[in-house]
Amino acid sequence: MKWIEVQVTTTQEAEEAVTNIMHELGAGGVVIKNPNDVKLLAQSDNWDYLDSSLFEEEGNIKVFAYFPIASDTTDKINILKDRIVELKSFGIDIGNFDVKVSEVDEADWENNWKQYYKPLKIGKKIVIKPSWEEYVSQGEEIIIELDPGMAFGTGTHETTKMCLEFLEDIVMPESIVFDVGCGSGILSITSSKLGAKEVYAADIDEVSVEVARQNVELNNLQNVKVFKSDLLGEFRGKADIIVANIIADVIIRLSAEAPKYLKEEGLFLASGIIKSRKKEVMEKIQPFFEILQIKEEGEWCTILSRKK
């Protein structure tokens, strides 16, 4: 089967918005190629293996979308271009925006992204292992089996990496964890393997919910429940930890609601915040939470806070 590959060159800031537009237009798959992520991992002591072919020049990211050939494909591509340009009106920098279109075979793209995803060690003992890769654990390493599919969350993105580092320090044996906007389920699965008693993971996107469920099953976990929810809407009870790796606007919305779902002195781990909006997010969080620590990496920051 033939597919249309649409390659969009843009900025890291626009990455998530561009990806969302592609999914909304019916892309059969989306691949993000970010050479800056590879460089950051290479400079860190906390990585296991990166193939030499991944080291490319720094620069803008490339987002690839794959659409089945149909009568309306050209219209979809034009809409995609218009909507990406429109992002500028929302204050999102799209950089030297460029679009390239080509025709490819299904076999060429459906596994293409896997070459950029290798076993990765994060923090002191967390290892994210693609389900198709071989890896022998060493010492007390915790192996997270993952097949992200079309959902966000592989461990290579700065926001996910910082969340994992925080979780390694804050998850306790009796912890109840709420994962809001769970994506691939990577944070929920890690929380469980770090010893959490119960983990509840939700996403508004049905594809993410299904991918997360598959990854929970892949890791043979019984204490992680995955369901569809618009933010905290379908969660019940109270948690010791709420983790949300989303975007700044959603973190701001959550800041007033999260305390109702947290136990006394519960922790709120918020990520997906672009550095330029850190101050704004902090101002919205502080009426409800005491900020304990902030991590920064690349263009992103992650905030750990405690319920007042």
Curated annotation (Swiss-Prot):
UniProt GO cellular component terms: cytoplasm
Keywords attached to this entry: Cytoplasm, Methyltransferase, S-adenosyl-L-methionine, Transferase
Catalytic activity field: L-lysyl-[protein] + 3 S-adenosyl-L-methionine = N(6),N(6),N(6)-trimethyl-L-lysyl-[protein] + 3 S-adenosyl-L-homocysteine + 3 H(+)
One Pfam family recorded for the sequence: PrmA
Enzyme Commission code(s) on record: 2.1.1.-
CDD domains to which the protein is assigned, alphabetical: AdoMet_MTases
GO biological process: methylation
Sites where the protein binds S-adenosyl-L-methionine: 160, 181, 203, 245
Main location: cytoplasm
An MF annotation (GO) of this entry: protein-lysine N-methyltransferase activity
Enzyme superclass (EC): transferase
Keyword Cytoplasm found: yes
InterPro entries per UniProt: Ribosomal_L11_MeTrfase_PrmA, Ribosomal_PrmA_MeTrfase, SAM-dependent_MTases_sf
Family: Belongs to the methyltransferase superfamily. PrmA family.
HAMAP family (alphabetical): Methyltr_PrmA
Its job: Methylates ribosomal protein L11.
Name of the molecule in the record: Ribosomal protein L11 methyltransferase
Source organism: Thermoanaerobacter sp. (strain X514)
